[in-house]
Structures are given as C-alpha cells and as structure tokens.
C-alpha cells in the first residue's frame, strides 16, 4: 500500500511486486546463491580472465554491458560481477542478480574518510545514513539503514582469522559527489559518520526488501578529514586485489 507524502521521495509502496520485475526477461539463467558484487574498477574482469571464469550472462544497461561470471572457489560456485558506481545503477544490477538466484552477497569498494584514517585501511559499515534516493523505493523512509548481523559476522570473522585490523563504522551514503559541502561534511561527522560512499544504504535496502543477505567491506581512499585541504591520495588502489581476495574468503565462509 502506498504511503503518500507532499515530497515524492518520502512516498513508499510496500508491495514488493512491480510492473517491471528484475527477471521480466525470463532468461534461461540460474546463478549461484553466493555472489561478490564489487566496486573495483577493472579488477573483476582481470581476475575472471586470470582464473578462467565462465561468463554465464550479461546485464545490459543503456551505457554499458556488464558481464556476469561464475567461478569455482574451493569447490563452491560463486557469482562474480562488477558493480556500477552510484546507488541507482548499483541497486538495479543487484536486484537483477537476486532475480536470477543470488541470495548471499558481499560487496567491496572504496570510501572517502571524514576522520583521520590512513589509506587502504579496511572498514566494516554497520550503519548507513540514507542521503541517496534509491533506498526510499525499497524500504520506508528512515534516517539510517542497519547492516545485517549475518554479513557483518562473516566479514569480521575472516578479517580476524587473518589478523587484519579493521574498524566498525557508520557511513554516509550520498548521491551528491560534488555536493559534499564543508558544512554538510562537518554535520555528518558530528552525527558519527566516519566515511562517505555512494551505494551502501541503497544496497542494504534492496537486500531487505528481497529477503537476501548483503554486507560490505570498505577500504579507505581519499580524505575529507581536513576541510581546507582535500586529499585524493591514491584512491585506495593498493587494496583492490586484497579486497577481492578477502571477499572470496568471506562469501565462502557464509
């Protein structure tokens, strides 16, 4: 039933059925239950080629076609896909993957830091501030999305087993890459946000509506900690291969 509001983004219909569903094409495609859905530039394609992954399908958007791979990892089939940047396209592709069989998903990607955190550090978001538009189409309006305990536990157990330090954080998910104003950054920091990215709250909302497990392993890139001296650093590039390796271990552990 739709909840009407003067501001359209705050309207919500809790009916999970839509006129156009993710599997409306009726493709002959059955994906594995486990999936890595990663924001890692070309790392997914590189790794898929390296290990001889099977390309089992494609997600076709208006601007790009995304291959969907299946690999055999320690005797278990795992789906592997590169996620597009931004809450709307990332949610659309993940919803499509779920529509064709995916049930347990781990994402990874970079985040900007609002606090004094070194580059290439691993972080586990446990709460996301919903400053993007997509999540409001999947879950009723609220200020935050809470991450699922099952996913958090799997991520942290693997990090601890490998002796990799990490922090639990609240993240600020925004659509406005060029609208992170000084006053807004300060406000988010006061509220407890340690990092900023563009998809976390939206993907958590997709998972909640569809009844699947999703979690994310973030690693640090640029820094907004000093409002007078923005530092792009090296965009977390040194952690890409390590992040993918960890995600494989995490999703296998689930």
Residue ranges and their predicted role:
Residues 1-106, 112-254:
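Accessory terminal and edge-of-domain segments that mediate assembly/interaction
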């Amino acid at each position: 039933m739709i909840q009407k509001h003067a501001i359209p983004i705050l309207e919500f219909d809790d009916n999970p059925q839509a006129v156009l569903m993710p599997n409306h094409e009726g493709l002959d495609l059955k994906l594995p239950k486990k999936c890595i859905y990663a924001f890692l530039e070309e790392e997914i394609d590189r790794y898929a080629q390296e290990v001889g992954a099977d390309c089992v399908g494609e997600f076709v958007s208006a601007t790009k076609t995304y291959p969907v791979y299946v690999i055999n990892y320690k005797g278990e089939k795992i789906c592997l896909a590169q996620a597009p940047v931004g809450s709307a396209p990332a949610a659309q592709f993940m919803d499509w993957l779920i529509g064709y069989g995916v049930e347990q998903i781990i994402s990874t990607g970079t985040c900007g830091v609002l606090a004094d955190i070194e580059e290439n550090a691993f972080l586990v978001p446990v709460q996301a501030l919903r400053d993007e538009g997509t999540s409001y189409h999947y879950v009723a309006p609220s200020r935050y999305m809470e991450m699922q305990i099952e996913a958090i536990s799997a991520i942290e157990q693997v990090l601890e087993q490998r002796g990799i330090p990490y922090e639990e954080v609240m993240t600020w998910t925004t659509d406005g890459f060029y609208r992170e104003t000084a006053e807004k950054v300060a406000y988010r920091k006061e509220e407890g946000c340690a990092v900023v990215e563009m998809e976390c709250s939206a993907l958590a909302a997709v998972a909640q509506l569809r009844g699947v497990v999703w979690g994310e392993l973030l690693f640090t890139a640029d820094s907004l900690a000093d409002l007078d001296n923005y530092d792009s650093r090296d965009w977390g590039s040194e952690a890409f291969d390590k992040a993918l390796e960890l995600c494989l271990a995490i999703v296998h552990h689930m």
